[in-house]
Amino acid sequence: MSIGIFDSGVGGLTVFREIDREFPFADIYYLGDTARVPYGNKSKETIIRYSLECANYLYSFGIDALIVACNTASSYAIEALRESFDIPVIGVIKPGVELAVKTTKNGRIGVIGTQATIKSGSYRTEIEKKGDFTVYQKPCPLFVPLVEEGLIDHKITELTVKEYLDDIVSKGIDTLILGCTHYPLLKDVIKKIYPHLNIIDSSKATALYLKKKNLDLNGTGERKIFITDESPSFEKLKDLVVGSDIHLEKLELSKICTL
């Protein structure tokens, strides 16, 4: 049995890593749409089209579950994906929210993400369904390019984190949802600056959420990672996040656009 995972770039590898740990015998196929990263500044229509194209390619492997390892795509394209494919389609928003509301002690939850994810209000909507919580949101558009360029431990990243987060942290939040799958790669930087925060990694939450589905996902343990454009920074970060054993395979963008 097999799992398909897609994201606009390298961020979804944090989900791949957690799925790999929880389902060591499943076949896992990952598609990073590096030719069109980021999705966070695209229109809703474009995000849906890109998501359907990525999902359709992964579906051609006969996958049994699809993980939308992109918060932007989870915000805008999840319903279109569920209508288009006859397998479980799991986004990263609901699992992260469920963990956050269980974790917070004072009911003040911060959410950071791309412009598109924050604008969609997806996290606020899901959190408010769970009860009386106060939600503070902040778009952090520079985080994705910083991660994609491999500047995880750079001084400029620390300064950018403070510039974005000082305001919502000052509101008294005790829990922060990393509302983009790139952001767990900045978790150590964020924790260093704000050690008191409970940081919710939606990647791990999503893997645990899938585990609760009790799907028969035993296979041969095959692992494949595809990208739609050459990216030295992706390869470097892939080695950091999931190791160097898995070879990258480049797809021509036209191949997924015409399926």
UniProtKB/Swiss-Prot annotation:
Enzyme Commission number(s) from the entry: 5.1.1.3
Residues of the active site: C70 (proton donor/acceptor), C180 (proton donor/acceptor)
Record keywords, A-Z: Cell shape, Cell wall biogenesis/degradation, Isomerase, Peptidoglycan synthesis
Pfam families linked: Asp_Glu_race
Enzyme class: isomerase
Listed GO MF terms: glutamate racemase activity
Keyword Signal (UniProt): no
Biological processes, Gene Ontology terms: cell wall organization; peptidoglycan biosynthetic process; regulation of cell shape
Record: residues binding substrate: D7, S8, Y39, G40, N71, T72, T181, H182
Family: Belongs to the aspartate/glutamate racemases family.
Name of the molecule in the record: Glutamate racemase
Species per Swiss-Prot/TrEMBL record: Persephonella marina (strain DSM 14350 / EX-H1)
Organismal lineage: Bacteria, Pseudomonadati, Aquificota, Aquificia, Aquificales
GN (gene name): murI
